[in-house]
Amino acid sequence: MRCRTGVLAFSVAIGLALSLGTVRAAPFMIVGNDEKVLWDDQGKPVMSLPGKDSVLILDLADPLNPRMVANLSLENSVVGPPVNLDIAPDGSIALVADSVTIVKEGDALKQVLSDKIWVIDLKANPPKLAGTVIGAKQPSGLSFSPSGDIALVANRADKSISVLSIKGTDVKVIDTVAMGDEISQVVFTPDGKRALATKFAAHKVALLEVNGDKVTYTKTDVTVGLWPYNVIVSPDGKIALTADNGGAGSSDGNVDTVSIIDLQLKPPRVIDKVVVGDGPEGLAISPKGNVAVAVILAGSNNKAAFFHRDKGYVTVLHVDGNKVTKIKEFDVGGLPEAAVFTPDGRYLMVGNYLDQDFSIFKVDGTDVTDTGKRFKVPGHPASARMSLH
């Protein structure tokens, strides 16, 4: 494939030149590439059998020139929010949820729900698959606790949350919390005492209490916007933001919102909404807490739709306490999914599924600028998360 100016091509060589010491000293990013689903000119899914998916570990010591540390042949899925993987707070392991696979029935291909969660040993040189956890149906968004002792996995089809115990690379399901509705993502508050889960089809966010490895659904829900797909919590734990997708996981031509939940109120509730565009999916907040972004699909995978745009875009938000305002927008690539900030908050990466690359933005305070640089990945980036350090 011909690379455009400013695009940094990766070598997908089997031999990996980086040492483990270099990897562990630098921020690194995990990326899930799904090679099973694309779309035709009428916007209909074109499916392929599994076997070409990959999970990448990338060294971001130089954010403008990311380097590949590992390319693991592991199945993962674009079906769901782009947060179906995460890196432990200490950087020792990563988890990847395999949400949906594809099988052949007669002459047709069909999507089938999976239940697997991959455990990747990031201390190994190079990083490698350390184990497989069998969870519930359609594991999707997931997050580690701030201490790294447990992780929570949103099981969409099972309408539950799996609680995983983490002891090195020994990861086990120790509990399953029934939620009563389809759950797409779950995140912890910074103090580790609460968690928030998006009830996608119910248009709500559920509140959970966390006490050690005991996770309890409080039966308290916050009504947000339509089809909340993704949720994040500010670094100070005072507010949460939801990506209200509006179109049940895709664009529909209508503008959608980010809801702001004040977590200091009792009970927590929505205090404002910001219009961000058609089909927000990726969602991220800077480690400094003053800038957030919503990644907008904008019908970029549906050429036949009246609302089609060739490119998706990123809506940049200024966060000042519990006040969130829209600053600007930037075009990115086709069907943008994940957004991640580097640990120092100075750079933002946005994955473009159809373009098979990431856009790189510079962040200076609340000023976000497009560097004009992109880096290619060997596949279609469906999800991404960043290490904490």
Which residues are covered by each model-predicted region?
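Bacterial N-terminal signal peptides
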Residues: 9-19
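Bacterial N-terminal signal peptides that target proteins for export
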Residues: 1-10
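Predominantly soluble domains enriched in secretory-pathway, periplasmic, or organellar proteins
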Residues: 4, 21, 25-389
